[in-house]
Amino acid sequence: MCGAIQLQDTKVFFPHPNAKLPVRKRDGEIEWVTWGKRREEICAFPEGGWARLSSIKDGRWTRMTPKPVQIVVERFMEKDAEGQRYWFDLEEGEFIQGLLAFINGEARVYVVTQEAEPQTAMIHPRWPRILQRDDVDASRVGNAVSAA
């Protein structure tokens, strides 16, 4: 599902109350955006840091005016049922698809997840959606959107 990310020397773990993810803006610059909502937070955003691809397609995020974005990382971490950590490197040009949600002018980013491939399903049944910049239609997901 993606419980943490790393970009250069920076590691970000979802449980941290100030966790932010690096989102590529249209101009190519990186903006760090608050990652989802923690259980203890009081706000209107959905709890958690992940958005199932199926729920996006079903329209469950529509009220938050969602925008697809590129989460730029070098690697991400997943835990298995026993809590063992596994780090997975992204290849050059790959990114994690994110969903930028807006409520009352505030933005939060959620990692888009889908069913895991058979070779990784034993670690976790859901997996971040990894896309290749060259394969993405720039008008749809492409160069992302500004978080502000």
Identify the residue ranges that each predicted region occupies:
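Short linear sequence motif anchored by a di-proline
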Residues: M1-A148
